[in-house]
Amino acid sequence: YTTLFRSEAILKLASMYNVTDELNRNVNKPDIRKVPASQDQKDGTKLFELADHLTPDQLRILGPRVTQENAEALHWYSAKYIGYVKNREVTYKYATATYPIFMRECLVKPAEGDTPEVKFYKIYEPLNPDKQWRFSYTPEGVKPKDYINGLSELKALYREFNSREEAAFKKNPANAEKPYKEQKLQEAFICSGERDALCVKSLGFSPIWFNSETYKLSEQDYKEIMKYVEVLYNIPDIDTTGRVKGTELALRFIDIHTIWLPAWLTTYRDQRGKPRKDFRDFMELRSKNEDFRNLMTLAMPAKFWYSKFNEKSRQWDHNIDADCLHYFLRLNGFYSLHDENSSSTKYIRITGNIVKLIKAKDIRKFIREWAQESFLSRDIRNLILNSPKLSDTALDNLQEIELDFTNYTHNTQMFFFPGCSMEVSGTGIKEHPANGSTLSHYVWEENVLKHKVR
């Protein structure tokens, strides 16, 4: 293991010898205390007390490089306890060394004149063995339905940045008669959760994140975020749901640069014994700034053309980026199929677990139709029609993929239908949706069972 990072080698050995750090209900639990409610403690009230700072152990739980300064920048605090009043009794949940409780102050609306600010707290219990109970909010009814975490902090950074830039601009005598034009921040990062966001912050970048992995970013949300940054990155999880949602977002907002975490990450196990999948998991193994910069270098948008204004002709020049073009095609399921028995390229399109054999002209047709459906300008449509980067020869370089077309394992049998797949074993039947299936087996389109499954 001399070629591995130290943390990576430790986790690899732990996996080999089945050494786990799984959450344990008998260990990872709060100190519960119940007392009669006082007269001023009404039923339904949530109580809490915040600590002055986070302990080193608590910071390590949040991320390998997270500091007190990072936590404060995103308004995270450690709670001594949280309490809930019900039936004239207060149930206090005290944090322990093996069960930290964190709270984030979330700004909804800043104070204006005599109107006080509107805010709520997000309660986070990361070591709760029951994952569905890790989050709660207080007070009731204050959190907006479509709240974007980190956006108020991003706006504050934008204001601070432009305040400094404007002061420097006005200090220069050459700008005496010129108006200052506000500048955007370089980038922000959509993260898949609280700890991923803190890890991004610990690297010196600005994170934003949603209250659910299935949150659908609206056009209005996207435009609001882009008021403040030049480039928006997304760091999805690399489990099945994360890949599906990351792909959907990349194709809905084609300027977003997606950072796909490396596949080797899933070969390591987390505290629950499941494959590692998120950015914090990556940071535990590769925590240097250089490691993150390498991921940023590989990030691409689904937008596969770029435009540059030509000062001589006073017109826009348009070009296709071949790397982004092939990435766009992969996002839409287009690959070349590895076949040792054939010297010619076989093009395929994968939809869920169903594979269709296609020709290069089908790929060109897809892009032409997509351009029309997306209402791209005539200049871009002509660029697509005339580009040699969509020729048969160029498409020979489409990413090659190897697929498993067997419909069984040593203990399961698979049946593929148009709308879903069924995995049958001695213990039962598991249904896999057409989009988001965890099956790593595929079927040719002509071999799909033509039956509608209820």
Model-derived features: positions:
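Generic non-transmembrane alpha-helix signal with a bias for helix starts/N-cap capping motifs
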Residues: S7, L54-T55, P64, G193, ...
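Short linear loop/turn motifs
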Residues: S15, L23-P36, E69-K93
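Short, well-structured beta-strand/strand-turn elements
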Residues: P64-S78, G204-K216
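Phosphate-handling DNA/RNA-contact segment within nucleic-acid enzymes
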Residues: Y84-Y228, G246
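TOPRIM fold recognition
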Residues: E112, A174-A188, E194-I320, I354-V355
